[in-house]
Amino acid sequence: MLRPFRRAMDALYWLCVVIAGVALVLISAVIPWAVFTRYVLNSAASWPEPMAVLLTIVLTFFGAAGCYRRGLHMNIGFFVGMLPERPRRAVGLVVEGLMAVMALFMVNWGIKLVDATWDNTIADFPFLSVGVTYLPIPIGGAILLLFVIERVLIGPPPEPPTEPEHGAAAAFE
């Protein structure tokens, strides 16, 4: 039963990485376009700034969930690492509990934010509901909660395999 859950979390993690990666690439394309139109064409496009803000929301919440799962989030493990085994596990459970509370906060208030802004539109994108732009908040919170559950039930995901010594880097030596 836990193996399918782990595989589902692996797939969800990669989905987060792809979504956040695409958002980052698009931000990296939109911002230079805004600079180009403003300073080279002397006619600033109105859409790049709000588009970059929307993509930043996507990048932030999907990227944060993915980083949490891989353990790439900010933490202070030095002092916890100095504790004996039993207190270290207790602190770990407290941390996971606090992460679950944060995830539930994101889901609860994110849904309320989406609901409150659903009928509003963005001036530069009149076809797009403001509520839709805030959907990454509750979705990211739900994904984060699933990753917390995974850590509590199964433990952290295994480290990805490292590149073998005879990998691509060896070809350039």
Set out the residue ranges of the language-model regions.
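Alpha-helical transmembrane segments and membrane-interface helix-loop junctions
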Residues: M1-E173
